[in-house]
Amino acid sequence: MNQTENKPKNYTGIVLTLTVLINGLIAVLFFMPKLDQFSHANIHILPMLNAIFNSFTFIFLLAALIMIKQKNIKAHKRFILAAFTTTLLFLICYVTYHSIAENTLYGGEGIMRPIYFFILITHICLSAIIVPLALFTLIRGFSMQVERHKKIARWTMPLWLYVSLTGVIVYLMISPYY
C-alpha cells in the first residue's frame, strides 16, 4: 500500500470556499435591496423559527458533548449531525428572511442597549468564525483524525454553543420590535 492511500484527503479548499460563500452571502444580504415580490408574505415567523433552530442546535451540541464524555462516539456523531442539520435549516430561514425583510432595529434603552449590542456583536463575529471551525472539526472527526479532531473541537464546541445560545438571546431581546 502506498502512502497516498493512507493520507487523509485535504478539504481545506472546500471548507474555505464554503466559508467565503456563506459569510459573503450573509454580508451581502444587509446591503442588497429586498425582494419586493414577496413583500405580501407573512415572514415574521421566520425569526422565531431561527431561534427554535438555534435552540435545537444548542441542545444537540450539549448532548453531543455529554455523549463524547461518556465515550459514546456513535451517539456523539448523531448529535453532531443533528446540530449541523438544524444549523443548515437556520441558515436557509435566515437567508430567506433577510433577503425579503428590512432589518429590525433594537428599541431597548438604558443598560439593556449596550448589553444587547455586546451580545449581538460577539454573536456575529463568532458566527463567522464558527463556519470553518465546525466544518474542519466535522471533517476531522468523520475521517478519524482523532487527535486533530480533539484539538480543534476544544475550540469549536464552546464557540458553537455560545453562537447558538446567543442567537436565541438576540431573538428574545429584539422580538418585541418586529
From Swiss-Prot:
<feature type="transmembrane region" description="Helical">
    <location>
        <begin position="48"/>
        <end position="68"/>
    </location>
</feature>
<keyword id="KW-1133">Transmembrane helix</keyword>
<feature type="transmembrane region" description="Helical">
    <location>
        <begin position="155"/>
        <end position="175"/>
    </location>
</feature>
<protein>
    <recommendedName>
        <fullName>Uncharacterized membrane protein YozB</fullName>
    </recommendedName>
</protein>
<feature type="transmembrane region" description="Helical">
    <location>
        <begin position="115"/>
        <end position="135"/>
    </location>
</feature>
<dbReference type="Pfam" id="PF04238">
    <property type="entry name" value="DUF420"/>
</dbReference>
<keyword id="KW-0812">Transmembrane</keyword>
<feature type="transmembrane region" description="Helical">
    <location>
        <begin position="80"/>
        <end position="100"/>
    </location>
</feature>
<keyword id="KW-0472">Membrane</keyword>
<dbReference type="GO" id="GO:0005886">
    <property type="term" value="C:plasma membrane"/>
</dbReference>
<keyword id="KW-1003">Cell membrane</keyword>
<feature type="transmembrane region" description="Helical">
    <location>
        <begin position="13"/>
        <end position="33"/>
    </location>
</feature>
<dbReference type="InterPro" id="IPR007352">
    <property type="entry name" value="DUF420"/>
</dbReference>
